[in-house]
Amino acid sequence: DYEHGSKEKIGVLITNLGTPDAPNKKELKVYLNQFLSDPRVIELPKILWQIILKLVILQIRPSKSAEAYKQIWTDKGSPLLDIANRQLNKIQSSFSSKNENIVFEVGMRYGNPSIPDALLKLQKKQVRRLLVLPMYPQYCAATTGSTFDEVTNVLQKWRWIPEMRFINQYFEEKNYIEALSNSIKSFWEKTSKPQKIIFSYHGIPKRYLTNGDPYHCFCLKTTRLVKEHMGLSDDEIMTTFQSRFGREEWLKPYTSCLLYTSDAADEGFCV
């Protein structure tokens, strides 16, 4: 039952990629199966890919990934989820005294708390307007596009669909560029200015770029805007891409190749 006559509520859904429930083989298998089964992430024929995924990748990768997650896991659990919850609390505190009709939830594309669960909470709070904010500054079909798919898949089952605004990018927003620049300056104050700053973005297959994905261009522009904002020269800043998966060519230059084939520490690189 909906309340009538009261001021309509605005729901804000903050989303991110996600995290396993625990840093062990069992939970990583569940998480990776959901993540790597997303057709936005892996653009290969479904039947062929599912055979590879189920018979090869999910037999090997969960154990290796679990060990990596154990290295970053804290007493509060997943760092990504902990950060997301702290961000949520600060945002809620900021708005609570200004507008009690705005409510917030966090939803992860993969793992928990899920986007469907977060939207259900907002539905129960009777939101009539919905703002979706994926925490991806640069639009990419594999991240922002996938989030849009999940949100709309849920909303299309609702009887009363709220008015929705979906923020699909903010890679060139002034406040974002200033925040990045201030973060770098703050680090310099604690250490020293390096000879070169490496902006390392998560990579995607080069094929996605040639098929029209703007992600690569948006990453380059973010780097350029930070460079201009901080008054740096071309020699003082560089864009690279990390986390290559499989044998296919991904966006270059690879961060790993830069660090492993050069004396990065001796040359004063800061990633």
Language-model-derived ranges and their functions:
Residues 260-268:
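Conserved small/polar residues in nucleotide/adenosyl-binding loops
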Residues 174-195:
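Hydrophobic alpha-helical segments within soluble ligand-binding/sensing domains
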Residues 206-233, 239, 245-253, 258:
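Redox- and metal-dependent alpha/beta enzyme cores, enriched for Fe-S-associated oxidoreductases
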Residues 8-103:
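N-terminal glycine-rich anion-binding loop in soluble enzyme alpha/beta folds
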Residues 79, 143-146, 172-175, 179, ...:
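Alpha-helix N-cap and loop-to-helix initiation/capping positions
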Residues 83-91, 146-154, 213-228:
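Short, solvent-exposed amphipathic alpha-helices that sit
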Residues 2-5:
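N-terminal regions that are enriched for targeting/export leaders
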Residues 105-179:
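Long, hydrophobic, well-ordered secondary-structure blocks that form the structural core
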